[in-house]
Amino acid sequence: MSRITCPITDCKCKCNKNNCVYCVMGRQGLPGPKGSSGNSIYVGTGVPSPFLGNNGDLYIDSSTGLLYAKVNGVWVPQGSLKGDPGASGSKGEKGDKGSSGEAGLKGEQGTKGEQGDQGEQGDKGDKGDKGDVGAKGDQGDKGDQGDVGAKGDQGDKGDQGDVGAKGDQGDKGDKGDQGDKGDVGDPGVKGDKGDTGDKGDKGDKGDKGQNGSEILFGLGIPSPDLGEDGDVYIDTLTGNVYQKIGGVWVLETNIKGEKGDQGDKGDTGSKGDQGDKGDQGDKGDQGDKGDVGDKGNKGDTGSKGDVGDKGDVGDKGDKGDTGDKGDKGDTGDKGDKGDVGDKGDKGDVGDKGDVGDKGDVGDKGDKGDTGDKGDKGDIGDKGDKGDIGDKGDKGDIGDKGDKGDVGDKGDKGDKGDIGDKGDKGDIGDKGDKGDKGDKGENGSGILFGLGIPSPDLGEDGDIYIDTLTGNVYQKIGGVWVLETSIKGEKGDKGDTGDKGDTGDKGDTGDKGDTGDKGDTGDKGDVGDKGDVGDKGDVGDKGDVGDKGDKGDIGDKGDKGDLGDKGDKGDVGDKGDVGDKGDKGDIGDKGDKGDLGDKGDKGDVGDKGDKGDVGDKGDKGDIGDKGDKGDVGDKGDKGDIGDKGDKGDKGDVGSKGDKGDKGDVGDKGDKGDVGSKGDKGDKGDKGDVGPVGASILFGAGVPSPTTGENGDSYIDNSTGVFYLKINDVWVPQTNIKGDKGDKGDKGDKGDKGDTGDVGLKGDTGTPGSGPIIPYSSGLTPVALAVVAVAGGGIADTGASYDFGVSSPSVTLVGVNLDFTGPVQGLLPNMAWSAPRDTVITSLATAFQVSVAISAVLEPIFLRTQVYRELAANPGVFEPLAGAIVEFDVASSALISVGTVFRGIVTGLSIPVNAGDRLIVFANTRTTSLISVGTVTGFISSGLALA
């Protein structure tokens, strides 16, 4: 055979005289591995969920400023990002004592005369008898019952049975035999060898490495189009920190250091001496009892005086004759409402009025028309259909036709055609896939820990933050290099407030002149309510009044208008039961008794005439259902079918078909499989994943050639933070906390109060405020300790107050929660502030009651003041700053009786009247320790201004 020309352009074939091996392109290589993700920074409120984030990620608690790092699946506290507050300014000096107070005021007005006694209430008239109600008319007769429905019709006769089927026709005769098959054809020619397979595709490009989270900077609120989810944005004007979550910038916290505390307010000047109290004037004679004045506005209830001795009950006077009916008096002023008196005896029941004449019984209504005839009974069920007649007998099968004659043998088939050319050989196997592209480079990681980083930790370019000191390291050439510290500098101590001006001393009040004995005053106008007077002397017991003569019985007076309801007074003593009065003459029947005429309603009985109306009376009972119709006669049995015709004789068998053409010769053998194509070229190396934005450090302004766009740079000498944008280093903010503001100048001392009238001057206000003492009492408190790698703050502790403690109180997030069916049953030891005040300091001591040995790692005792949330009663939040923390177990052996102390001063935390405060103690650790609890007695003192 001739040489075969390779159909592939520029192919380097290895040909021989029989075939050619085509070069095959190798398969496409696998994609390179995805570059490692940069670490993410999360911001939220409270302790992070264990399901949030991956190892190496960061979390900022915006409520406390605590920074956490995820290590081996656990969020470990690293430290606080907020700078320390500046120191408080010095307390201003105490003001000078105020001058003496002004002259005393004129003495108070004399006491108002007592109110006259209230008149007795008249007897209530007898109630008239109620008339009898007339009799009700009789009800009309019920209509007659309807007739029974008619009997249902008889059912229809059943259908006639079907006629039997006709018999089957006889079978057709058999077909003649087929002729013999022709001879098999010759085998076909073997097919050509298949073509060489194509070269495999080029391997895929490796995946791009994933960017790390970016830290962005700007002035003001970030644009929604800025950054990607997980990025952090710092507003350099305010220090606010935002995180992009779900495409939205969410405000999380503020990184600027706290402003220094304001200097203490200067002491208030001493209060001036109060003038001596003037001598009390002689008590004036009691004025004549004044007329009852117009009722004044009801004053506040004064202190209740002693109840005077009860006067003797005077003899009951004879009932006087009823005087002529007086003119109706004006409605008196509404008196104070007396307490409900004891219930009087029940009056005698009045005589029953005469029974009204019974109304005539209405005429009996005419008998109602006969009710409509009952509905016709339902038609009886249709009779059952007659049975289907028996099917006629099947006709006899006709005789089978005679078998046809065997056909002549068919002619021998023609020789089969040459077999088809064998299929082209399969394409050679595709070349091996190209090698996987190189892995993209990882983004830089941010790591956290306690103390100097281990040389084995991290990779070149990674950042490490020591959460104990705030020192920032970068790994360069396998070595951790100290770069800077991110903790803000402590604010300068505020200047001492200027000394308040000395308050003017109040003038000493002149001694009041002894008051002259007052003349009996005219009846005064109703004045404003005065202050509650001193308790009056118990009045002398009154003389028993003379018994009055019995008056004549007068005409019964008209019922007076109902007076305004008096205010409720004190419950009076139960009076003696009066003698039963003589039964009065039966008065004219009260108007209400006329209602007895209503008895005419009995005439309504004529309504029975309604029966005359042709309206259908009560519906007659439904007629009985008609009897079920008789079952129809059974249908006649069907006729027997006719016997089938005898089958026709079978046709003579056809001549056998010509023998089939011989089979096509066997297909030639399949061509050999083409040679395997050459291995494909190695896929191109995947692009290197973008390196996470780098954080660089240096002293001074960064060089334009340093770093790449998106990198950050921290000037160690100033704390200025730069971001490289379009090849230019742009200052963004300063990560060091702002220096605390200078303490405000102390307020000028208040001017001394003017001396009070008459009374001896009070001692000046003490220089310091009250102290609220707290103690866990007679029983020591066992506080739980977090004993895991990295340590942490225990969420279970104890509250305590004035000699009592409640152990096993659990924080909910950062708050104390005394609500709900479980927490609501815990003792709530909060107390309420009775006035506005300010917390100035907190001190705590802890006395060990169970020895602690071989700890050698710090265990910090924490006590903090919590305040109830106004919007959520029963839930208390921690007061920032009102916390004391000290180490109780960092030496080899802590024996029973050892005392540890801590104090925080210079606080200025306002507390409003009505606020509820509670003190809570728990522990904090920084590493794995072997102690599960620390036990002892806790005491604290809270200083208020």
Curated annotation (Swiss-Prot):
InterPro entries given in the database record: Collagen, Collagen_superfamily, Exosporium_BclB
Cellular component, GO annotation: extracellular space; virion component
Biased composition (Polar residues): 703-712
Chain positions carrying an annotated carbohydrate: 211, 442, 716
Domain (Collagen-like) ranges: 83-142, 146-205, 257-376, 383-442, 488-547, 554-613, 635-694
Record flagged with keyword Repeat: yes
Modification comment: May be hydroxylated on lysine by the viral-encoded procollagen-lysine,2-oxoglutarate 5-dioxygenase.
Compartments where found: Virion
Comp. bias regions, Basic and acidic residues: 109-145, 168-208, 488-687, 736-754
Biased composition, class Low complexity, residue ranges: 756-765
Pfam families in alphabetical order: Collagen
Keyword terms: Collagen, Glycoprotein, Hydroxylation, Repeat, Virion
NCBIfam families, A to Z: exospore_TM
PANTHER family per UniProt: COLLAGEN ALPHA, COLLAGEN TRIPLE HELIX REPEAT
Functional note: May participate in the formation of a layer of cross-linked glycosylated fibrils at the viral surface thus giving it a hairy-like appearance.
Protein's UniProt name: Collagen-like protein 1
